């Protein structure tokens, strides 16, 4: 028999703090529940236990509290955001049939120990899942600790404990008696840390052994004095740190077998929590009202009989029998259309003929693949009249997914009819109608009709057109990078004196700090930190550090961009990136295959990557880029006179900022002052405080704080705007862009300072960054339409951050540049005008 025991409090805390804030539409927190259930499901899948027990701490004091008043006295209370999830999680586990166990006066650790001891007596296998290293003392021939870390779950048996710590599992009690435990406020011996404690136990076996050999020369005088002064604390700590294996709980076989529970209640609760993705993984069926009737599916050939009017079109979710989300149907069609309570199975070929049919209006749940079909067939998708997924995105940009079934559950929609072949068919029309009404109620109709929906067609056309790349140039660049990589490696190995795995932070740390003796800056759990910030601070100590930084740059460019680009070049020599419209919470676009937003530009080598995006023979690339759009929007939104005046007079905003702050003429502003002003201009917008700014500028926190205060005194309109934005967001629960795009910020109501501060940063940044995203999207729609209206061959092919790139025949390039500049600058009429610079070149680097 195999028993799995979960340390409930330890794992739920790890889930809560390890997963970003998740809430339901009505503001209930769910991240701890979602994370804990994922941990449980992964453990069940990996280990297939016969029985499962979930151990919980109780609020009542334990025997350890009675023994030592200071026990766990320094711990903060449970965050309210977690506390409100605990009873819900326990109810969910009960509904699922899992047995929870707790015992007044005893801790969950003692329950783990008691169950492990019972299994050992029967020679049964026991698995203890926890994030607490205290449980490692329980590892035995029958008990394995499944230690949850930030990245993985590590199985720790006695041999693994010996290899990591150099002592037996039970000797970890002796180690803790010496080093103490700050998290539990166990005192130990003041001045003795883990390294010294391990050395003492490795040499003398136990705490008693240490004191029996207190005069041993291996115990230095200073250490001896500490041990003698704190012997009582050490003995107390040993008692406090020992897990007791005799808690009065059920231990008989069968006590923790899974019970029938209430699967329907569990499914209902998960639906209410908007965690529907767990329902199929738990083998549950979503609770739905009985349908009024079951409708048949008409074959595609029936479509000509009704080939006019309005159809609601969606794709059947890809599923398998194992996943159990939907039944798998014996039909090649994955598309369906609903009209007048009739459901039609659509082959892609038949669907394609409808995409530009003037007699029909297609209400698409997701228009992106439909537009892709249309452009591939030489059309434009003129029959598509709306997009339900975009409506769902506008209403909740933080949603985990935008599936019809998930959204219907969230809105409490139950279909009026059933269709076994297409289970979502009965939900589609009422769902889209409900979301359309919500878009209207929340004032986002103009945002949908003038920006988001028309943009879907533009993006599909851009993907279809693609951008030509210089494949040979990319390959040659890759060869050069590999040569440079080899040179870096040779110099690094020569400086260190031996070869090692440069991609291993542990081995690199040993080479730099142990072998070369460089001063370590900070340590991680696995050893010395070798992150970029650390290495950059060490460049003056040894030339090898610069070689390591260069090695990382070359490796990143080669693996991510050279090899990454070569993999996605199509037969036509072009890259057809997928533009994602419903990913970023601020409304910004992203892209995949490749991620064009991450094409590097900050280094000379990285910027050379742009040279490989080229125009075909007889054409040129036209690149138009907004100048400081977010700062211009900040000046407009805040109404700050000094900032507005600088832009209206065409002055360098960063130079002008420095001049205003230090009361000097623009011409006396030094490069250093301008750089500081630039950092503050952008830092204010992104909610940076004095600490972050001090790191950006390489100054003290005190100096950075003075800079910030001076800035806010100089631009009081900005300060007032930021304060009012946060206050408004706290009152409403969301922030809006100037176009009305909303982003809910439940973080603002958190009692956790870090979570709340993060929410305030998002409140400052989202209205400006989101408005910039809205503007670039609107500009794309206007440019795309203008090029077609003038009958030009020029095509919009790329967007990266605040840039738009058009591929134009040489004869049209100048006109394309004029159109880009005009449409981008005039798509809004704000108190601070937008500024765009357009350039022409044979490749992206030349045009930028």
At which residue positions do the language-model features occur?
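Non-catalytic nucleic-acid-binding/docking modules located in mid-to-C-terminal regions
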Residues: 49-53, 98, 121, 140-144, ...
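Active-site-proximal helix-loop-helix substrate-binding element of RNase H-like nuclease domains
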Residues: 152-176, 183, 328-459, 483, ...
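Conserved "right-hand" nucleotidyltransferase catalytic core of DNA-directed polymerases
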Residues: 230-349, 361, 424, 429-604, ...
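Function-dense linear segments that define catalytic or interfacial modules
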Residues: 371, 385, 389-417, 427, ...
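Conserved catalytic core of nucleic-acid polymerases
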Residues: 464, 576-577, 581-584, 659-792, ...
């Amino acid at each position: 028999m195999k028993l799995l025991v979960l340390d409930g409090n330890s794992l739920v805390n790890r889930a809560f703090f390890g997963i970003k804030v998740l809430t339901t539409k009505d503001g209930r927190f769910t991240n701890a529940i979602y994370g804990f259930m994922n941990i449980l499901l992964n453990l069940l899948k990996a280990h297939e236990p016969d029985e499962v027990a979930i151990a919980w701490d109780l609020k009542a004091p334990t025997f350890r509290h009675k023994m030592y008043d200071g026990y766990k006295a320094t711990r903060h209370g449970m965050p309210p955001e977690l506390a409100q999830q605990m009873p819900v999680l326990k109810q969910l586990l009960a509904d699922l049939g899992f047995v929870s166990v707790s015992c007044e006066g005893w801790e969950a650790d003692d329950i783990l120990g008691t169950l492990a001891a019972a299994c050992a007596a029967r020679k049964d296998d026991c698995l203890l899942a926890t994030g607490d290293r205290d449980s490692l003392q329980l590892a035995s021939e029958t008990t394995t600790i499944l230690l949850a870390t930030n990245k993985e779950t590590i199985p720790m048996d006695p041999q693994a404990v010996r290899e990591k710590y150099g002592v037996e599992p039970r000797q970890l009690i002796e180690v803790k008696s010496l080093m103490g435990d700050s998290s539990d406020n166990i005192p130990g011996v003041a001045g003795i840390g883990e390294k010294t404690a391990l050395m003492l136990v490795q040499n003398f076996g136990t705490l008693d052994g240490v004191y029996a050999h207190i005069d041993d020369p291996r115990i230095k005088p200073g250490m001896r004095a500490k041990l003698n002064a704190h012997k009582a604390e050490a003995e107390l700590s040993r008692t406090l740190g020992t897990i007791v294996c005799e808690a009065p709980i059920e231990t008989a076989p069968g006590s923790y077998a899974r019970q029938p529970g209430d699967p329907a209640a569990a499914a209902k609760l998960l639906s209410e929590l908007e965690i529907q993705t767990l329902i199929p993984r738990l083998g549950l069926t979503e609770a739905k009202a009985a349908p009024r009737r079951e409708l048949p599916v008409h074959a595609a050939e029936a479509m000509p009989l009704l080939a006019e009017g309005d159809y609601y079109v969606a794709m059947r979710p890809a599923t398998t029998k194992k996943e159990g989300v939907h039944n798998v149907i014996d039909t090649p069609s994955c598309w369906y259309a609903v009209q007048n309570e009739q459901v039609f199975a659509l082959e892609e070929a038949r669907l394609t003929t409808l995409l530009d049919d003037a007699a029909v209006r297609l209400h698409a749940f997701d228009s992106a693949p439909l537009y892709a079909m249309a452009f591939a067939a030489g059309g434009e998708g003129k029959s598509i009249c709306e997009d339900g997924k975009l409506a769902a995105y506008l209403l909740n940009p933080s949603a985990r997914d935008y599936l019809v079934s998930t959204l219907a559950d969230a809105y409490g929609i139950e279909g009026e009819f059933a269709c076994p072949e297409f289970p979502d068919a009965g939900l589609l029309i009422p769902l889209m109608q409900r979301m359309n009404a919500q878009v209207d109620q929340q004032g986002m109709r103009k945002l949908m009709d003038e920006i988001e929906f028309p943009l879907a067609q533009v993006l599909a056309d851009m993907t279809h057109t693609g951008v030509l790349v210089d494949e040979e140039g990319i390959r040659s660049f890759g060869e050069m990078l590999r040569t440079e990589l080899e040179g870096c490696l040779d110099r690094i190995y020569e400086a260190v004196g031996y070869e090692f795995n440069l991609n291993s932070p542990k081995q690199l740390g040993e080479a730099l700090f142990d072998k070369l003796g460089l001063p370590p800056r900070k340590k991680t759990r696995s050893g010395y930190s070798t992150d970029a910030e650390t290495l950059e601070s060490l460049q003056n100590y040894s030339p090898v550090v610069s070689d390591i930084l260069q090695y990382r740059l070359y490796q990143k460019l080669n693996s991510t961009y050279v090899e990454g680009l070569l993999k996605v070049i199509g037969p036509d020599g072009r890259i057809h990136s997928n533009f994602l419209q419903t990913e970023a919470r601020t409304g910004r676009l992203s892209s995949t295959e490749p991620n064009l937003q991450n094409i590097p530009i900050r280094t000379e080598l990285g910027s050379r990557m742009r040279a490989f995006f080229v125009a075909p023979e007889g054409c040129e690339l036209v690149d138009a880029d907004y100048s400081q759009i977010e700062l211009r929007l900040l000046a407009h939104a805040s109404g700050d006179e000094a900032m507005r005046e600088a832009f209206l007079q065409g002055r360098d905003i960063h130079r002008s900022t420095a001049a205003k702050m230090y009361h000097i003429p623009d011409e006396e502003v030094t490069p250093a002052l301008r750089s500081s002003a630039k950092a503050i201009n952008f830092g204010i917008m992104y909610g940076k405080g004095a600490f972050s700014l001090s790191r950006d500028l390489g100054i003290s926190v005190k100096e950075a704080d003075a800079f910030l205060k001076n800035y806010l005194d100089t631009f009081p309109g900005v300060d007032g705007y930021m304060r009012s934005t946060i206050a408004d967001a706290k009152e409403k629960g969301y922030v809006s862009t100037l176009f009305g795009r909303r982003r809910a910020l439940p973080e603002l109501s958190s009692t956790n300072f870090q979570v709340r501060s993060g929410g305030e940063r998002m409140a400052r940044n989202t209205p400006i960054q989101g408005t910039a995203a809205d503007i670039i999207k609107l500009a794309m729609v206007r440019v795309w339409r203008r090029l077609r209206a003038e009958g030009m061959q020029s095509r919009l092919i790329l967007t990266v951050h605040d840039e738009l790139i058009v591929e134009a025949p040489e004869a049209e390039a100048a006109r394309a540049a004029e159109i880009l500049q005009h449409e981008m600058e005039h798509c809004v009429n704000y108190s601070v005008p937008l500024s765009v610079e357009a350039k022409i070149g044979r490749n992206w680097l030349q045009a930028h």
